[in-house]
């Protein structure tokens, strides 16, 4: 019941370097502590970096979140957003969206991975897994001609997803401009016995794995995450989308969060189906307790 759930401000920035444009917070439980990963800047969005908060309390609503610092993703401190972590074979990994080099006239967001020595420190060089080189990943102009002030090609919002039988690790990411109806999900896949820091271990989907549905009146489907039903029997995708085809680049407030169930194919690849209309009533996730 997100509408009526308790909300709490857990941290307020005091350092000007990370006091503006706080984006995409994620909370993770790692080694008995809570960690929040988020991106922020000093007021210039070209300076976005990743930051980490830590809370040693068992209850994230109790205790105190303290700043562990900025994650240094590369020696040049290139733009970095949308950090997410996952554990595999006893190792901790970070995936995120970043620039190869500082933007001049064209902005290109790519997907990176690195190994971590602890929840706020990388122990390997960043490895490029994907850049927006497919046509459906490079759309930044809306159907009515609206576009940002410069060219933007997007791969962002990477989310790890392990297959149910443990054969694959999928990284589902968002591509194209979120202000366009073309915002969609792509997927990178590696076998769990592969070297995850080897770009050759990853296979990239040629087509979107989840995209707009004009027939259902749903557009700009992206920046997702995953969760299970209370009894662990069902898988759900959480994403944001719009009910309109066209928006201006600054009108993100029209996006709304949506969730729906997805299934697994026999080959251990997810089948997300199509985004459902907001007018459709869905059954509660399996195991939901009645009030």
Enumerate the language-model features and the residues they cover.
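Carbohydrate-active catalytic/glycan-binding domains of CAZyme proteins
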Residues: 1-291
């Amino acid at each position: 019941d997100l509408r009526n759930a308790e909300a709490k401000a857990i941290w307020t920035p005091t350092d000007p370097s990370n006091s503006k444009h706080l984006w995409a917070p994620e909370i993770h439980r790692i080694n008995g502590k809570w960690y929040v990963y988020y991106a922020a800047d000093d007021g210039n969005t070209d300076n976005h970096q990743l930051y980490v908060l830590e809370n040693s309390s068992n209850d994230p609503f109790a205790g105190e979140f303290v700043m562990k610092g900025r994650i240094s993703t590369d020696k040049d401190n290139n733009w970095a957003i949308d950090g997410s972590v996952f554990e595999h074979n006893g190792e901790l990994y970070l995936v995120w969206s970043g620039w190869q080099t500082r933007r001049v006239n064209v902005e290109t967001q790519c997907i990176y991975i690195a190994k971590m020595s602890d929840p706020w420190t990388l122990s390997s060089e960043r490895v490029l897994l994907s850049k927006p080189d497919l046509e459906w990943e490079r759309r930044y102009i809306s159907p009515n001609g609206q576009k940002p002030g410069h060219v933007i090609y997007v791969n962002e919002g990477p989310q790890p997803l392990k297959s149910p039988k443990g054969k694959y690790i999928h990284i589902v990411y968002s591509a194209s401009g979120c202000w366009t109806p073309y915002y969609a999900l792509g997927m990178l896949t590696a076998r769990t016995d592969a070297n995850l820091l080897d770009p050759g271990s990853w296979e990239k989907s040629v087509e979107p794995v989840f995209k707009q549905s004009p027939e259902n009146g749903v557009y700009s489907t992206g920046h997702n995450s995953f969760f299970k039903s209370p009894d662990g029997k069902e898988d759900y995708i959480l994403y944001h989308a719009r009910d309109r085809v066209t928006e201006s680049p600054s009108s993100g407030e029209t996006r709304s969060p949506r969730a729906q169930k997805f299934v697994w194919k026999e080959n251990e690849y997810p089948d997300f189906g199509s985004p459902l209309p907001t007018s459709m009533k869905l059954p509660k996730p399996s195991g939901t307790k009645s009030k």
